[in-house]
Curated annotation (Swiss-Prot):
Residues 6-226 form the BAR domain. GO terms for molecular function: GTPase activator activity; phosphatidylinositol-3,5-bisphosphate binding; small GTPase binding; zinc ion binding. The modification Phosphoserine is found at S384, S387, S521, S573, S576, S767. Residues 548-561 have a biased composition (Polar residues). The modification Phosphotyrosine is found at Y734. GAP activity stimulated by phosphatidylinositol 4,5-bisphosphate (PIP2) and phosphatidic acid. This is Arf-GAP with coiled-coil, ANK repeat and PH domain-containing protein 2. It comes from Rattus norvegicus. Pfam families: Ank_2, ArfGap, BAR_3, PH.
Length: 770
């Protein structure tokens, strides 16, 4: 070890020694400053490194999130995952490097400064103190006078002791200086060497890590080159396709008009339509509609679950809507609700209507057998009230309706194609149909044919009676009168196109109806009328039914002796309440109905309760709301009321009769039914939406007439209907369709009117007593 300060000079305490000490002390002070600065920089570097590792970890988490996002791309996901794992290892290596830096630089140099330099400073303080004491002893010894021997000896002893202490401390101080100068070299070099070895280990680990990752990176680079080439190729193809599409004419937007019944994904057609909401504001909202799985559904967003508009297309129909201000509208009607839709153009509207009709037909063909296995689901007839969960005693349903309707002659086979065991019916025509023909009937629209299922739908008693009054034989005698004469053959089962053409010609164009050769003018009709005053008989005597009832079954439907046709028991009229004496009109009995105007024929047949004649009149184009100017503008529906037939009224209503059309006296069907005390008809008209607030020329509404006549049953019905109407108005559009008590009472009256009408004849019987 090379001595920085000489021990001999220390003993001499020469100026050279003092100069050497001054130089060493200055050097040590500067060394302390440098080491303190280096330690602070090391601490800052370590803190910054830790922050770098923390930020790097967040960056790695971002890469992992991106890898999870790219889970559908195996190459990207695998690459990002592998790279993030490798970089995470590098973060771990950085953490180790910073830990080793803290131990090698910060800890070692701080220990050197705190331990060795502190000892040097302590030794320096002792040396400076003893040096000062030595100087004081020398000065005191020099100042002692000769004649003071005692003081001389004392000063000499102090000086000797002080010199001895000085030499001892000075030698220790010099030793500390020399040791410090030697140790600082080793400590600094040792720290830096440890720091460099830490870096060596860091880069060696990184090299090993990336050596393993190198082949994968090389393969990925090759894949990337191929991806770049493929991307350039796809870009050229897309640019070419883009250029081709730009050259097309999109003015008609024919691409949206396509529909495919046999689509692999089950979607027949899809696209945007406007849907009218059922809220109070009737707002229109644009939604994505699709026809799939025999259902019409829509959704606002793709992630939303589709909302089902029509659960079973077989139970609905579609028609144009021209009576609203918005263009291109059409309506999908099911037994329980309707949905108003709007397309963007006329072509799109036609395409959607055709798609719905085609889907309905396809559903009939493919699911004919399955439909019979479906759960019995209630779907009230057109115009009737929502009846909720009815008991079997109050509504006829399923096999019961099927058996009763098929008992009518001709109803055991399809009316149009002859297929056996038909399970569908057209309620306004009174015929039975196979499932395929019923689909074609639905496509005609409800103004031509209203289709119901004999096994799936719920049948109210008056509707079932109507079906039993007509039948396939009766209707075919009218609509196929000229079939053999024209040489036309009925289509066979399975020939759908032939069926569709035949059914349209039969019911829409009415090509096979035997038109009347000549129709007399009104003046000629008057000449051939045999008039007699029979109004008194009509208003004061009980009118007997056309058919004589001979048997009653469990449903309350009475069979007739002549042809098995069903009819209602007769009802009597209340002559005291109807018209003042002397104001009764003369009724007309005609010689031959074929010479009558179809409207007049319907008018006459409605009073006579002759449903076959009524069907014939409608087939010849009779207006169901025809008004007889010779009899106070009375309508066929009013005549049906006067005739006392509930089934006749039901038939006219099913064929579009206006329940609120009034005669010149201001009396509608509800007025006349109330005057005559026909409780069943009052119940029927109220269910069909008759206006009970309308007043006649005398200012009387049906309720005041019933109260005046003291007809408790009709008063009950009218007041209950009025109360229910007020409840619905107070609840607004979002209220329930009717109170359960109201529905139950009306069902009871409907059952009683159809099955036990004699129970409702109390008013007539009481009036006859007087």
């Amino acid at each position: 070890m090379k001595m920085t300060v000489d021990f001999e000079e220390c003993l001499k305490d020469s100026p050279r020694f003092r100069a050497a000490l001054e130089e060493v002390e200055g050097d040590v002070a500067e060394l302390e400053l440098k080491l303190d600065k280096l330690v602070k920089l090391c601490i800052a570097m370590i803190d910054t490194g830790k922050a770098f590792c923390a930020a790097n970890k967040q960056f790695m988490n971002g890469i992992r999130d991106l890898a999870q996002y790219s889970s559908n791309d195996a190459v990207v996901e695998t690459s990002l995952t592998k790279f993030s794992d490798s970089l995470q290892e590098m973060i771990n290596f950085h953490t180790i490097l910073f830990d080793q830096t803290q131990r090698s630089i910060k800890a070692q140099l701080q220990n050197f400064v705190k331990e060795d330099l502190r000892k040097f400073k302590d030794a320096k303080k002792q040396f400076e103190k003893v040096s000062e004491e030595k100087e004081n002893a020398l000065v005191k010894n020099a100042q002692v006078q000769r004649n003071k021997q005692h003081e001389v000896e004392e000063a000499a002893n102090i000086l000797t002791a002080t010199r001895k202490c000085f030499r001892h401390i000075a030698l220790d101080y010099v030793l500390q200086i020399n040791v410090l100068q030697s140790k600082r070299r080793s400590e600094i070099l040792k720290s830096m060497l440890s720091f460099m070895y830490a870096h060596l280990a860091f880069f060696h680990q990184g090299y090993d890590l990336f050596s393993e990752l190198g082949p994968y990176m090389k393969d990925l680079g090759a894949q990337l080159d191929r991806l770049v080439v493929d991307a350039a190729k796809e870009k050229r193809e897309m640019e070419q396709k883009h250029s081709t599409i730009q050259q097309k004419d999109f003015s008609s937007d024919d691409s949206k008009l396509e529909y495919n019944v046999d689509a692999a994904n089950g979607i027949v057609m899809e696209g945007y339509l406007f849907k009218r909401a059922s809220n109070a504001f009737k707002t229109w909202n644009r939604r994505w509609f699709s026809i799939q799985n025999n259902q019409l559904v829509y959704q606002k967003k793709f992630k939303d679950s589709p909302t089902v508009v029509v659960e079973d297309l077989r139970l609905c129909t579609v028609k144009h809507c021209e009576d609203i201000e918005r263009r291109f509208c059409f309506e999908v009607v099911s037994p329980t609700k309707s949905c108003m839709l709007q397309a963007d153009s006329e072509k799109l509207r036609q395409a959607w209507i055709k798609a719905v009709q085609t889907s309905i037909a396809t559903a009939y063909r493919e699911k004919g057998d399955e439909s019979e296995k479906l759960d019995k689901k209630s779907s009230p007839s057109t115009g009737s009230l929502d009846s909720g969960s009815e008991s079997k005693e109050k509504l006829l349903k399923g096999e019961s309706a099927l058996q009763r309707v098929q008992c009518i002659p001709g109803n055991t086979s399809c009316c149009d194609c002859g297929l056996a065991d038909p399970r569908w019916a057209s309620i306004n025509l009174g015929i039975t149909l196979c499932i395929e023909c019923s689909g074609i009937h639905r496509s005609l629209g409800v103004h031509f044919s209203k289709v119901r299922s004999l096994t799936l739908d719920t049948w109210e008693p008056e509707l079932l009676k109507l079906m039993c009054e007509l039948g396939n034989d009766v209707i075919n005698r009218v609509y196929e009168a000229k079939l053999e004469k024209m040489g036309v053959k009925k289509p066979q089962p399975g020939q759908r196109q032939e069926k569709e053409a035949y059914i349209r010609a039969k019911y829409v164009e009415r090509k096979f109806v035997d038109k009347y050769s000549t129709l007399l003018s009104p003046s000629e009709q008057e000449k051939r009328i045999i008039s007699k005053s029979c109004e008194d008989q009509r208003l004061s005597h009980t009118r007997v039914s056309v058919h004589t009832p001979v048997k009653s079954n469990d449903s309350g439907i009475q069979q007739c002796s002549d042809d098995g046709r069903e009819s209602l028991p007769s009802t009597v009229s209340a002559n005291s309440l109807y018209e003042p004496e002397g104001e009764r009109q003369e009724s007309s009995v005609f010689l031959d109905s074929k010479h009558l105007n179809p409207g007049l024929q319907l008018y006459r047949a409605s009073y006579e309760k002759n449903l076959p004649k009524m069907a014939e009149a409608l087939a010849h184009g009779a207006d169901v709301n025809w008004a007889n100017s010779d009899e106070n503008q009375a309508t066929p529906l009013i005549q049906a009321v006067l005739g006392g037939s509930l089934v006749t009224c039901e038939f006219l209503l099913q064929n579009g009769a206006n329940v609120n059309q009034r005669d010149v006296q201001g009396r509608g069907p509800l007025h006349h039914a109330t005057v005559l005390g026909h409780t069943g008809q009052v119940c029927l008209f109220l269910k069909r939406g008759a206006n009970q607030h309308a007043t006649d020329e005398e200012g009387k509404d049906p309720l005041s007439i019933a109260v005046e006549a003291a007809n408790a049953d009709i008063v009950t019905l009218l007041r209950l209907a009025r109360m229910n109407e007020e409840m619905r108005e107070s609840e607004g559009l979002y209220g329930q369709p009717g109170d359960e008590t109201y529905q139950d009472i009306f069902r009871d009256f409907s059952q009683m009117a159809s099955n036990n009408p004699e129970k409702l004849n109390r008013f007539q019987q009481d009036s006859q007593k007087f």
